[in-house]
UniProtKB/Swiss-Prot annotation:
Originating species: Shewanella sp. (strain W3-18-1)
Alphabetized GO MF terms: ATP binding; CMP kinase activity; dCMP kinase activity
Matching NCBIfam families: cmk
Subcellular location: Cytoplasm
Gene it is expressed from: cmk
Protein family (similarity comment): Belongs to the cytidylate kinase family. Type 1 subfamily.
First-listed, main subcellular location of the protein, grouped into a coarse class: cytoplasm
Entry protein name: Cytidylate kinase
Amino acid sequence: MSERAPVVTIDGPSGAGKGTISQLLAQHLGWQLLDSGAIYRVLALAAIHHDVELENEESITLLAAHLDVKFLTGNDKDPVQVILEGEDVTTDIRTQECSNAASKVAAFPRVREALLRRQRAFRTAPGLIADGRDMGTVVFPTAPAKLYLTASAEERAQRRYNQLQDKGFDVNIERLLSEIIERDERDMNRPVAPLVPAEDAFVIDTSGKGIDEVLELALKHINEKLSSAN
């Protein structure tokens, strides 16, 4: 890891626009991209590919320490393209099998510690955009610029509904809203790494704002913070 490489953390609840803004910032700045929300799914898929037993903490930990994963800027439907061992697995990691496996591997403390180190290794020149839920509080607490994106539960449910509809899924918006509210409650009150803004984070409420407006606010804050850090 290069401590000199700047890192911008982007935290917040699901549907607040983190993925899209992270992609656009990485493109604009020409920096590396980390989608921490996908990394446990990627590890689970790697375990499945290599026939590693999901109950074997030692083997999963070893796999996590050497996980060959890259995150590239994607497109409108998938803002982040996930590459595992040279293969595009953006769609593969979204299956229910992978989701269930991710929950299993995430339960191991040694696996979580290995993935924490692996995530920090993404901090390389010229810089890193780190998208997640505890990037500014746990993974990169000394990051020079931290953003926290949020939006009303109703707006986030509508965004998720539109996204899934565009992909051909038949979804119920009331159920999506209920799931978002439940997840918010769970994430914000969990004992380890709760979903809260870092004390020095710049909070952007994306409700009613277009992508360009949010991007402009983010870039203005990042430029100010990086200028004062140099």
